[in-house]
């Protein structure tokens, strides 16, 4: 159970929650990318996807640059990672049932330590193709919609119409699954859900003084995307992933100094246990702290309402305080 929970938490740290707060990737402590093979292999795969269900390339796509095709594939894979579309055994029923939240909420594996994703909390968003999908009840992304992120990304990279982009996005995911880069799961409603095998998400520690360009910044909206050394060149000068932004991504260096990066890399992390968290104290010490807080005339070292906020944890009704 501990191993399952650790693997799930790691997937959240480098996936769905990678941009929330001071995460390891956001602070430049680690580089994360999806290992999908050589750039030439991905480019060939993308070019085959342009042929749809037939051999060869559809008319009008012969002149698409390799850099655009590579950005198309790489952007798709990294978006899946950041959306939390990383496979885990706890998400199997969730995927088969079209992303219904009950499998990661009140029907989750509580006994194994699976965390809850109630309404209001962002949930893993796997791309889904085929069949109908009620987006009011599912966090999954309907790839076939011309308004989906995947269709929009395809339109930006290949400069095609939204409807055509949605079809190409579906074909690309299918080709990636055929190549073993993605997994494909049939759903109860007849759709197909695509996911990243956890083993393809690679995490690499970054040194404090590396001079590599490991940050992608949009030249228009200034959106920042941490990048790994293995993939930053594949997205340099690619379209901005923000749906409504016309800008391009530019590779640059991360800030030279980071408080959180230095803290995470430190060997001696100290935990501060505040006295007002009295469940951590012995009975005698707890009584002394509580009495010192409540007495009308306090000594200089007594905790007071300005520094001790969790008063209910000390068994004190704050309404009784003057």
Residues covered by each model-derived region:
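Conserved two-lobed SF2 helicase motor
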Residues: 299-318
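Helicase motor interdomain insertion/brace
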Residues: 1-295
């Amino acid at each position: 159970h501990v191993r399952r929970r650790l693997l799930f938490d790691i997937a959240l740290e480098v996936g769905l929650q990678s941009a929330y707060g001071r995460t390891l990737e956001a602070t430049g402590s680690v580089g994360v990318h999806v290992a999908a093979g050589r750039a030439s292999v991905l480019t060939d795969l993308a070019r085959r996807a342009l042929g749809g269900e037939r051999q060869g390339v559809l008319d009008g796509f012969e002149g698409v640059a390799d850099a655009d095709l590579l950005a198309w594939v790489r952007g798709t894979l990294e978006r899946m990672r950041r959306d939390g579309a990383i496979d885990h055994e706890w998400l199997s029923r969730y995927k088969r049932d079209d992303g219904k939240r009950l499998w990661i909420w009140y029907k989750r594996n509580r006994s194994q330590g699976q965390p809850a994703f109630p309404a209001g909390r962002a949930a893993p968003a796997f791309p889904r193709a085929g069949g109908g999908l009620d987006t009011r009840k599912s966090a999954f992304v309907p790839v076939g919609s011309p308004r989906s992120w995947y269709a929009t990304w395809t339109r930006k990279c290949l400069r095609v119409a939204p409807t055509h982009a949605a079809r190409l996005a579906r074909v690309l995911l299918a080709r990636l699954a055929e190549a073993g880069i993605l997994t494909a799961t049939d759903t109860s409603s007849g759709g197909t859900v695509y996911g990243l095998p956890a083993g393809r998400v690679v995490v690499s520690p970054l040194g404090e003084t590396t001079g590599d360009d490991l940050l992608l910044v949009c030249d228009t909206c200034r959106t920042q995307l941490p990048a790994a050394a293995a993939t930053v060149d594949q997205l340099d000068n690619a379209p901005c992933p923000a749906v409504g932004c016309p800008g391009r991504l530019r590779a640059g260096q991360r800030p030279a100094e980071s408080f959180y990066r230095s803290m995470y890399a430190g060997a001696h992390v100290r935990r501060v246990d505040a006295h007002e968290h009295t469940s951590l104290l012995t009975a005698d010490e707890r009584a002394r702290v509580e009495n010192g807080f409540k007495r009308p005339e306090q000594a200089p070292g007594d905790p007071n309402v300005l520094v001790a906020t969790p008063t209910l944890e000390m068994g004190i009704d704050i309404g009784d305080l003057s």
